[in-house]
Amino acid sequence: MSSPQLYQRGDVLLADLPFADVVRSKVRPVLVVQNDVANRLRDNLIVVAFSSRVPSLPLPTQYRVKANSPLAQRAGLVRDCVVDCSVIHTIAKSRIRRKIGSFTGEAMDEVDRCLKISLALA
């Protein structure tokens, strides 16, 4: 019997995310933002969504990742995108397809800044 996959904060995963109507879903990349203790103990993960709709000037709640940058390569991302910290999901681990990469500590610091703005914690 295989052991359950352990996910860490900063992992970039492909997940089957539901649309707002919850009837339909789409496989898309997400970034794990939940702490590692909860990641290990819970059946769910807190993630933020990536969007390929990149505005010319990202919002304060968005962190831009350019295709072909070292971060995009490390994260397994092939298109320009933004981490949209205004789109936060709690998803079951069963919705995860696979890990495609991870963010650096520096990039996660920027994501944390965006999350604080999104959640009015700053």
Stretch-by-stretch model annotation:
Residues M1-A122:
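Conserved functional hotspots at enzyme active or ligand-binding sites that engage polyanionic ligands
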